[in-house]
């Protein structure tokens, strides 16, 4: 008989809400091992008895478990020999500081197959799920993740589902959100000119939804994390009516397609992009458009010709709707700047007040907190998350060192917040406009909800340096209530820290931070920054040369003002009738501020090329400029030769290299738009190369909203790696302000409890940035 031992295994990773414990039980029984498995909230604890060789085999199986499970770390220790009669799963218990809230997981292939199989008892059941898929975060009342702690507690299991739930050999064993036609949520509808709730059969409702879409109507659909508006994406009239309804003039829509094969009719798809489309998160993936796809979708879907946002069905109902084999526009049901509608009463009110919506399809399952669709892409050979919401939120990101409990409240433009405990940072992105009271109130509620859900009471708060951000004001208010200190982190340093935290960097690095705006330590507006970072400190060693820019939120949206300010600075005349007013304002210092913004420079070049004068949505002008540059690359155009002037200024903190874009303007205007757009991108890449060469630092960080630009990111990565640099950028977190709170939290985790002060020389800072 083989010598037996007992071991305790502590397993960390994505092991909650993914059918991990039943899989562990099956594996142990196959190997004739005995013991127990228990969910501790943030990890899984296994006691296992058997031959050491079999336990080794068991461990290998754990690490190779299929997604969505992901084993990141196993701590193994021998314990006194303990005889067990069998291998069993025992009830969950909470573990101090080990709370883990699982993310929603898109419908899996096994459930899709069942849902589309005639005769299966879940055939055409829109809310099908198993241990490998289904809602989690959006239906979770409290931890640990057990059925009685979710919105599915309102749906007692029928006898058949209960047997599946108990059967350790069934893939629905301990599936906390499993249901069927007999015991789970039901598809319901409101239709114009029909009785308020039917009665209609499930098949009638599904067919009605498909028929309405085929006829070009707009329908409202309850998804996993909120309500969506849906129409067919190949009809101009339908998409234009949707734009009017949403008050969304230009911002691109994403398209839902049934399969990767359908997506390939519209876009070029690499192996990595296919994996991302089919991943458990089912995010929107930004893909390169096929030229032949133009007739297949309405031009009203997007004004961009080179890229398209596409995603596969994240849950059963969308998989059934996508069977019509027409690309569907799916967008959040809200107005621009407001959070997605997720409460039933609000959804009913929205439907009743908008007659252009032909029907509302819903169920009575309660959504406890919303989650918009995530947005991703493959860039420089890696996944880049641009919006980290459904499927990713609230899963934490592990950092290298344990630290204090921190609440970080991010910036202003792309609201986010983060909570940290031990070596984990939980980061949330809140797509909304905090200048709107409804959005600001929602943001505050969500912060409080996460604190309660994760059992985290912060020891310290961290906010942006800008004195008048809503989030900074909220930080000061909360700090007073909780009697804890507040740390302020300079905006671009926060971006740098987000990359350092994600990639476990603490040595000296050059951080290249390009974005639209951020309050600088000198009281001016920063945005085209080169920061020499080490540990948690930084020195500004370079920047786009600051010029006088007309301030105010509206001016930030007006690319033509950015252009005219640059022309005034460069001494280049303009025949624009508005130029005289701008020149006088700059000369007199009237409502102006010094700015080194790279984002505003992208806007100015876009306006100079006649691509766009106004940001009707965030980043529009820069996206159109990138689109033209991508067009030039596809058509193999020779880029216009453009350059910056370089000058060195001595300051009390050392030398600062400024890059003046003045030489750009005479060459840009009047040139081939696509060639000039590509030339501008290459000029920016060259100044990044130049600063890396000047500083001699091996490690380079790329962050800030401008690095959502794939051409810029990939160009910088390729150029820097070609010169032997180690290059890091945001991948698990967004490069823009959506990832800012993550960097702030990391700063706070490892900083003494004292307020950090910066000297600011600007007057009237509020409202000028």
Predicted ranges, named:
Residues 177, 184-186, 411-449, 470, ...:
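A contiguous, well-structured pocket-lining segment that forms one wall/lid of small-molecule binding clefts
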Residues 264-270, 320, 340-347, 373-374, ...:
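Conserved phosphate-binding catalytic cores of ATP/NTP-utilizing and phosphoryl-transfer enzymes
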Residues 500-571, 587, 592-596, 602-608, ...:
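Active-site histidine-anchored catalytic micro-motif
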């Amino acid at each position: 008989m083989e010598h037996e031992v007992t071991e305790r295994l502590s397993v960390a990773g994505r092991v909650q809400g993914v059918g991990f414990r039943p899989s562990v039980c099956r594996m142990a029984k196959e190997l004739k091992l005995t013991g127990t498995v228990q969910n501790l909230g943030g990890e899984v604890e296994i006691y296992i008895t058997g031959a050491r060789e079999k336990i080794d085999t068991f461990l290998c199986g754990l690490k190779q478990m299929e997604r969505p499970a992901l084993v990141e770390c196993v701590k193994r220790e021998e314990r006194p020999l303990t005889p067990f009669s069998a291998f069993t799963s025992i009830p969950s218990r909470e573990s101090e500081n080990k709370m883990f809230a699982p993310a929603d997981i898109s419908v899996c292939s096994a459930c899709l197959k069942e849902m589309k199989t005639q005769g299966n008892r879940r055939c055409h059941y829109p809310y099908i799920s198993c241990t490998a898929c289904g809602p989690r975060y959006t239906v979770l009342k409290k931890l640990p993740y057990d059925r009685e702690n979710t919105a599915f507690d309102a749906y007692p299991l029928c006898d058949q589902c209960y047997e599946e739930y108990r059967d350790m050999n069934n893939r629905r064993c301990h599936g906390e959100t499993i249901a069927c036609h007999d015991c789970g949520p039901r598809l319901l509808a409101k239709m114009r000119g029909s009785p308020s709730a039917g009665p209609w059969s499930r098949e009638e409702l599904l067919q009605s939804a498909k028929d309405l879409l085929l006829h070009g109507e707009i329908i409202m659909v309850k998804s996993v994390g909120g309500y969506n508006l849906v129409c067919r994406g190949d009809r101009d009239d339908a998409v234009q009516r949707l734009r009017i309804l949403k008050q969304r003039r230009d911002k691109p829509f994403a398209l839902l397609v049934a399969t990767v094969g359908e997506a390939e009719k519209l876009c070029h798809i690499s192996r990595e992009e296919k994996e991302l489309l089919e991943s458990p998160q089912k995010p929107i993936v930004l893909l390169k458009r096929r030229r032949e796809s133009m007739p297949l979708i309405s031009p009203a879907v997007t004004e961009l010709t080179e890229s398209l946002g596409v995603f596969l069905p994240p849950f059963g109902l969308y998989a059934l709707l996508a069977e019509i084999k027409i690309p569907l526009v799916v967008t959040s049901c809200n107005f621009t700047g407001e959070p997605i509608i997720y409460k039933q009463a609000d959804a009913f009110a929205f439907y009743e007040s908008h007659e252009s919506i032909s029907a509302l399809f819903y169920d009575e399952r309660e959504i406890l907190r919303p989650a918009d669709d995530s947005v991703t892409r493959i860039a420089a050979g890696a996944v880049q998350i641009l919006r980290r919401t459904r499927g990713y939120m609230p899963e934490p990101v592990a950092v290298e060192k344990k630290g204090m409990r921190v609440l970080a409240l991010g910036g202003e433009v792309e609201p986010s917040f983060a909570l940290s405990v031990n070596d984990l940072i939980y980061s949330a992105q809140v797509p909304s406009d905090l200048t709107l009271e409804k959005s600001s109130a929602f943001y505050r509620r969500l912060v409080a909800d996460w604190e309660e859900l994760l059992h985290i009471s912060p020891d310290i708060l961290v906010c942006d340096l800008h004195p008048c951000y809503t989030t900074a004001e909220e930080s000061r208010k909360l700090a007073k209530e909780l009697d804890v200190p507040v740390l302020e982190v300079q905006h671009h340093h926060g971006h740098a820290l987000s990359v350092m935290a994600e990639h476990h960097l603490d040595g000296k690095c050059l951080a290249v931070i390009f974005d639209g705006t951020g309050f600088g330590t000198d009281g001016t507006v920063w945005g085209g920054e080169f920061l020499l970072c080490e540990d948690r400190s930084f020195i500004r060693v370079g920047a786009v040369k600051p010029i006088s820019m007309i301030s105010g939120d509206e001016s930030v949206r007006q690319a033509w003002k950015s252009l005219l300010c640059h022309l005034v600075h460069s001494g280049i005349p303009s025949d624009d009738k508005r130029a005289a007013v701008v020149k006088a304002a700059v000369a007199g210092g009237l409502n102006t501020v010094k700015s080194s913004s790279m984002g505003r420079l992208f806007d100015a070049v876009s306006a100079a090329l006649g691509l766009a004068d106004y940001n009707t949505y965030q980043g529009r002008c820069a996206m159109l400029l990138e689109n033209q540059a991508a067009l030039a690359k596809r058509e193999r155009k020779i880029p216009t030769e453009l350059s910056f002037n370089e000058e060195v200024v001595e300051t009390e903190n050392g030398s600062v290299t400024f890059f003046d874009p003045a030489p750009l303007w005479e060459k840009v205007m009047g040139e081939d738009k696509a060639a000039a757009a590509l030339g501008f991108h290459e000029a920016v890449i060259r100044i990044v190369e130049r600063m890396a060469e000047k500083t001699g630092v091996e490690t380079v960080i790329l962050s800030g909203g401008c690095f959502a630009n794939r051409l810029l990111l990939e160009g910088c990565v390729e150029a820097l790696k070609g010169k032997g640099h180690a290059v890091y950028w945001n991948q698990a977190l967004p490069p823009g302000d959506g990832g800012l709170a993550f960097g702030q939290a990391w700063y706070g985790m490892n900083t003494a409890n004292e307020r950090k002060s910066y000297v600011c020389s600007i007057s009237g800072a509020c409202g000028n940035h």
